[in-house]
Amino acid sequence: MKENIYDKKSYDLDTSAQLVFNYIKKKFGKREECICFYQEPRYLTQYGFVPSLVVLDREYGIIIFKTYDYKDGDIYYMGEDSWIVKGERIANQLDYLEDYEYELKNDLFRPVNKLKPSMLSINSFIIFPFLNSDTIEQLDETIQDAIENNQILFSDFNIVLNKLESSKMLKENEWKMLRSVIQKANGLSKSLGIKIKEPVKNLRDAITLNENKIYLLDEEQLDAAMTLNNGCERIRGLAGTGKTIVLSMKAARLHALYPDAKILYTFYTQSLYKQINRLVSIFYKKLTGEDLNVDNQNLKIMHAWGGKIKKGVYSEMCKKINVKPLSYYDMRFEKDPFGKACSKLIDKNLTEEYDYILIDEAQDLPVEFFKLICKISKKPYNIVWAYDELQTTGDVKIPEPDELFGKDEYGKAKISLKRDNDHILKKSYRNNIRVLFLAICLGFGIYSKKGIVQMIDKEETWRALGFKLDDGVLKYGNNVIIERPEKNSPMNIQSYYDKYNVLNYNLFDTKSEELDFISNKIITLVKEESVKEEDIIVIDLNSKSAESNLKYIQRVLFKNEIGSMIPGFVDGVDDFFVEGRVTLTTSRRAKGNEAPIVFVLGIENLYTTMNRINDKINRNLAFIAITRAKGWCFITASGEKANLFEEEYYEIFSKFPRMEFKYPTEKEMDEIGKINYMTSNDEILKTSYENKETFLKFISQDPEMLKALLNDDEKEKILKYLERLND
């Protein structure tokens, strides 16, 4: 039996639930297809009723328990209208239980779930494990009937429960649906109520079928989303493992349970605003039956930095202490613009404002921001941060809490992370295994002729990401084999519709041919395959030419009566996935978003420079772009470098699903470390590498970067540049 006790603080004080739970473990403990929830699932009942324990069993159905810790002499009277407990009149608790059971059945037996009352039995009990029935002075006829019918049990409750009999065994799909409903996961469904028959006839139906499939949170995701503890939590996982979903569910759950608590949800990518708001709203309504009030000041969803129009955590801090917020433009010559801006507030008197703080995309935020978060968090620092080791231009390493939040005057970490609160999400549900495998091999440069640009140095970290070391030891210069088990990438959308490979690439002689191919393919998908425009995203890997390339595609689509948008160039930066419009963008703007169909434009950009720093950046951008695909991925390249991608592609998949390579030598790892240092800030590099003068001015102010850059071959050359620049 799986034990899902998420609110451990409450359970530790709930002696009556503990007693009944110990009995349940004896009766159901050895059953594999059985789950016991504590105070779950919750519904917005008229009386705010919460069950003590709910057992979900594939053969026994659903068993609901409400336990009370009343003892002999506590209850004087139990009647149909009210009870007298400890000298006070309270409502008949059977009404509460029946109200809850009614809401549960309404949720279970909605037509979309395809569950019927005849499929499973539902039993519910009120239990007084510390009370003998003969100590109650008065019982009216209604309550006596309930006792005789075993709805109300007392200290001898085990006698009745031992007689519980199993019912009809649920089918596998019914059991999966039952768990999904109880876990609230089907609140994510974007189904329009359209029934799709298999086999599907076009790509749109395949997308709809995939979205209508049950999204069942796995144990790691469910534990991360539902657990409530005092103190901090960390959530780790690859792209597509559900980190944003988990944080959104946690935010909705906290707001539903503690409406007066101050909750902050912050993130790095501006285009995530709509997605996070949508997810939190879906889960909140699922939990409470009410629409989320987006203007509620107790739940704030804000960008980390903020801007002229959008509020941000940093900008709001500044306003509260009458300090002018610094913009990226103000800090553009700093190595870490946002970190430097945050550092100017660290010594200021900031108010401990929030009871709970949730941080998405933690890998992209500077340490100084976390120190500010610590200052605005109330004790015991209920801070949850989600981290993706591979979606950062910096080092593939997760900083520990003492690095993020600092130490106290005694040298101890201000915030400690308990092992049970370090959640690892291994399974990637967004990306097909081939898509994810290609993204990682390209992103790390596993088979790049220029050499590996990024590496994970611990087997434990590889395992945490859902890989396994098949052969070798992670030591300098060793031959190693690392595999991605298929079970950790279960998404297989191509099985619904195999007209297109889930992963495609096309090479062209000229850029115009490449752009025409993408434009025409989109036209075909929309007009012949009935794909919705908002289900398509085009990502250009070359930021220099992105605006002109994307506008070209936009013009072609417009002529064919297909709407599109270009966030940041033509439209607002967070305008993603608007109904009836294809999204045309860059990797940096696409970060954090996803789409059923992704076009990755200009993959030859990986091979246009021999500079190792740019190589690392370009490969990371390719990783981000490819992993946006939660369905089909179309990759294109043009020009004389295009064939280099094809060569690397074939080498990657000749070993699939295993990566066979030589682990970097000590010298190579040192070089990778230098590259990581020099690519540790995405924003400054985005500007600097496109402007040599800006870049040289930037590195002239950073001795560590100069040290990393000035190898024997380039030292003289770069020094001369700097001398001319400073004249």
What are these regions (language model features)?
Residues 35, 62, 356-359, 384:
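Hydrophobic "anchor" residues on beta-strands that sit immediately upstream
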Residues 98-110, 619-633:
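Metal-dependent nuclease catalytic cores in nucleic-acid-processing enzymes
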